[in-house]
């Protein structure tokens, strides 16, 4: 079945990059992609500082290596997902199967919802570990990176919640079956039927057309007639 469904036009239609770039969902994915870089980038570059007791590096978030790893994995996952879903949005117009479109929208909805929750957990976790961090020369140097990761974790919550809402709206759009009516049902019930072909031996050149349903049924009761023997 080829037609408009789940917020996209008919399959095989020409791709318009200008209108695609102006879509709210596209802008949200780009913003979320930038936010993900702003989270894992500072942690990778400046998130590990020298400890006061030795040359080994420790995580700036209270020395908890799990906090740094969680922030990096969360940011990298969001980075890859934004790129993948952007490519899926580009190809979405070419998907002719309504079932495949539904699966793509459900995947977007499920992933966006899960990542919104993980961003909330990550924001709370990083904030808690930063509040417990003991001030020192290393933490003062990497303080800006830690605060940037926390701030953009919060912004990522908002952007991914917005993506979840947009995916839910697209899922609720579903499929408008009226768009396929002209393809499946033809031009209507009053379509004229062609007459007999020439040389078939049947006279008459007029075409037959089904009459409109305006006739009334004869509701008068007929009397009982005695059969003749």
From Swiss-Prot:
<dbReference type="GO" id="GO:0010807">
    <property type="term" value="P:regulation of synaptic vesicle priming"/>
</dbReference>
<comment type="subunit">
    <text>Interacts (via N-terminus) with SLC6A3 (via N-terminus). May interact with VMAT2.</text>
</comment>
<dbReference type="InterPro" id="IPR016579">
    <property type="entry name" value="Synaptogyrin"/>
</dbReference>
<protein>
    <recommendedName>
        <fullName>Synaptogyrin-3</fullName>
    </recommendedName>
</protein>
<dbReference type="GO" id="GO:0045055">
    <property type="term" value="P:regulated exocytosis"/>
</dbReference>
<dbReference type="GO" id="GO:0045202">
    <property type="term" value="C:synapse"/>
</dbReference>
<feature type="compositionally biased region" description="Polar residues">
    <location>
        <begin position="209"/>
        <end position="223"/>
    </location>
</feature>
<keyword id="KW-1133">Transmembrane helix</keyword>
<feature type="modified residue" description="N-acetylmethionine">
    <location>
        <position position="1"/>
    </location>
</feature>
<keyword id="KW-0968">Cytoplasmic vesicle</keyword>
<dbReference type="GO" id="GO:0042169">
    <property type="term" value="F:SH2 domain binding"/>
</dbReference>
<feature type="transmembrane region" description="Helical">
    <location>
        <begin position="70"/>
        <end position="90"/>
    </location>
</feature>
<dbReference type="GO" id="GO:0030672">
    <property type="term" value="C:synaptic vesicle membrane"/>
</dbReference>
<feature type="domain" description="MARVEL">
    <location>
        <begin position="20"/>
        <end position="172"/>
    </location>
</feature>
<feature type="transmembrane region" description="Helical">
    <location>
        <begin position="148"/>
        <end position="168"/>
    </location>
</feature>
<dbReference type="GO" id="GO:0008021">
    <property type="term" value="C:synaptic vesicle"/>
</dbReference>
<feature type="region of interest" description="Disordered">
    <location>
        <begin position="209"/>
        <end position="229"/>
    </location>
</feature>
<feature type="transmembrane region" description="Helical">
    <location>
        <begin position="30"/>
        <end position="50"/>
    </location>
</feature>
<dbReference type="GO" id="GO:0031594">
    <property type="term" value="C:neuromuscular junction"/>
</dbReference>
<dbReference type="InterPro" id="IPR008253">
    <property type="entry name" value="Marvel"/>
</dbReference>
<feature type="transmembrane region" description="Helical">
    <location>
        <begin position="105"/>
        <end position="125"/>
    </location>
</feature>
<comment type="function">
    <text>May play a role in regulated exocytosis. May indirectly regulate the activity of the plasma membrane dopamine transporter SLC6A3 and thereby regulate dopamine transport back from the synaptic cleft into the presynaptic terminal.</text>
</comment>
<keyword id="KW-0812">Transmembrane</keyword>
<dbReference type="Pfam" id="PF01284">
    <property type="entry name" value="MARVEL"/>
</dbReference>
<keyword id="KW-0770">Synapse</keyword>
<keyword id="KW-0007">Acetylation</keyword>
<dbReference type="GO" id="GO:0032411">
    <property type="term" value="P:positive regulation of transporter activity"/>
</dbReference>
<comment type="similarity">
    <text>Belongs to the synaptogyrin family.</text>
</comment>
<keyword id="KW-0472">Membrane</keyword>
């Amino acid at each position: 079945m080829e037609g408009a469904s789940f917020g996209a036009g008919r399959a095989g239609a020409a791709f318009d990059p200008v209108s695609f770039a102006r879509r709210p969902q596209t802008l949200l994915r780009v913003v979320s992609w930038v936010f993900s870089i702003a989270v894992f980038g500072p942690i990778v570059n400046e998130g590990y500082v020298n400890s006061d007791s030795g040359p080994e590096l420790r995580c700036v978030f209270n020395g908890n290596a799990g906090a740094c790893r969680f922030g990096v994995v969360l940011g990298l996952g969001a980075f890859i997902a934004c790129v993948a879903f952007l490519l899926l949005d580009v190809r979405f117009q070419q998907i002719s199967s309504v079932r495949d479109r539904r699966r793509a929208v459900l995947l977007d909805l499920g992933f966006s919802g899960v990542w919104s929750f993980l961003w909330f957990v990550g924001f709370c976790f990083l904030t808690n570990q930063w509040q417990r961090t003991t001030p020192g020369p290393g933490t003062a140097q990497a303080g800006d990176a830690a605060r940037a990761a926390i701030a953009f974790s919060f912004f990522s919550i908002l952007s991914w919640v917005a993506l979840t809402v947009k995916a839910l709206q697209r899922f609720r759009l579903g499929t408008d079956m009226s768009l396929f009516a002209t393809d499946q049902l033809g031009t209507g019930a009053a379509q004229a039927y062609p007459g007999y072909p020439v040389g078939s031996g049947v006279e008459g050149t007029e075409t037959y057309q089904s009459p409109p349903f305006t006739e009334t049924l004869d509701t008068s009761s007929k009397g009982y007639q005695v059969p003749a023997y």
